From Swiss-Prot:
It comes from Talaromyces stipitatus (strain ATCC 10500 / CBS 375.48 / QM 6759 / NRRL 1006). The keyword Metal-binding applies. Keywords: Aminopeptidase, Hydrolase, Manganese, Metal-binding, Metalloprotease, Protease. This is Probable Xaa-Pro aminopeptidase TSTA_094700. GO terms for molecular function: manganese ion binding; metalloaminopeptidase activity. GO terms for biological process: proteolysis. Binds 2 manganese ions per subunit.
Amino acid sequence: MSPSPALHAAAFQGIGAPDIQRFHINLSVGSNVNRYPAKQHARKVASKLGISRGLIYLVGKPTVFLDDSDQTIPFRQRRYFYYLSGANEPDCHLTYDIAKDHLTLYVPDFDLRQTVWMGPTISIGEALDRYDIDNARYAGSLQTDISGWLRLRGDDSQIILLHPDHRPPIEYEQDLFETKNLVPAMNAARGVKDSYEIEMIRKANIVSGLAHTAVLEKIGQMTNESDIAGLFLETCMTHGAPDQAYGIIAASGENGATLHYMKNNEDFGNRLSVCLDAGAEYECYASDVTRTFPISRTGEWPTPEVRDIYLAVERMQEECIRLIKPGVRFRDVHLHASRVAVEELLKLGVFQKDNSVDAIMASGAVSVFFPHGLGHHVGLEVHDVAEQSVMAATDDSSPRTRVRGFLMQPASAMSAALLEESMIVTVEPGIYFNRLALKNARTLPIARFIDFDVVERYYPIGGVRIEDDILVTATGYENLTTAPKGEEALDIIRRSSVKSSRA
């Protein structure tokens, strides 16, 4: 079934599937996207803090060496620091004087030995030109600057930290630091994206789409999960995105039943399909994309079972995406996905056919096959922060219930986070046949709802998951994910097979 046009992102308007492999995008930040809006973010965080005075102090990620080695751990900037600076450089610090609306970035002091071996660190002039800041200073002046601020501060002003152990290198009084409010304030600020952030996530998705397409074009020639992971990474790097938002999951066959499978080293053999969960990171912003497709030269599903489960998950995703708009409780969308899963598995006989959809839903048995939430925020982290998780309940009187590891239905209606315009969330339904989970389910009361003889036919599938990144707009949604799926993905496999046979 072809995905509804409404479920596609607009990023490839005018570009058909046959042309996507020839489409090379310019991913440099151009005239439409200015410098990273650090000052805007700082003001937003100060507003969430609800105070008019104080000094926010953040320390960036320092250079860290591997244990017992002279080699460094690959650098990854602390995301809270990046949100207030846009600086993807090690060994930096920043301060933001709330009363003066003054943002200062501290860069590493010049080190000749470092320059000879590793190249020069960023200079003051380069920092002022590159970043949306009011001032740039060398790190050696940090202690003097903060001490000077303390002498001039009012009695009600504090230095505001993310964590108690992130204190600046100064002599201090115990009551000088406030360490409880900055994390929730920054989480609330980061949950709703601005136009710059949306553009970065859109670009990350474009790169991911190109990489997923490259895999579809070559899947008929591949023999091992590592072939998939290697080509995906190579394609991302070629298009200006050398970092992945998370570890690539290239799970073939029953490995797809492990949600975060990352070994990526097994031969396909006679396996049916691949669950590829992989997303590029662009300028520190994540994409999160999952596609499931047959291991096939013909672009056809090898068995009715894997085809039927794919179509079930496809229905789950398409219906849920259409529900996305401001004011919707994401938990309600998750429950709709669960209900669709029950309906489909009941039709296939995986659930005993003498049971009703309502009875199965009330039992929580669907959690054996759909054990995770429908989605999460995406941003500077692949599982990004927000004032509240989209799957979180806020009503303590209605706790979630669990039965030996399985997340069950809510005991009663729950007050959960509402979607807001400019949030970006994933919609990633899945159906899985995990042998250990189902073995455990045999010992639970929910076993009476499951036909374990029928389940045997579905184990070779492992799992099917489809995942897109969805921007909440003023009136609904926009799908930022461009990676082909459904019939479009199968067509790419078919065309590539024809080209390969002619070569």
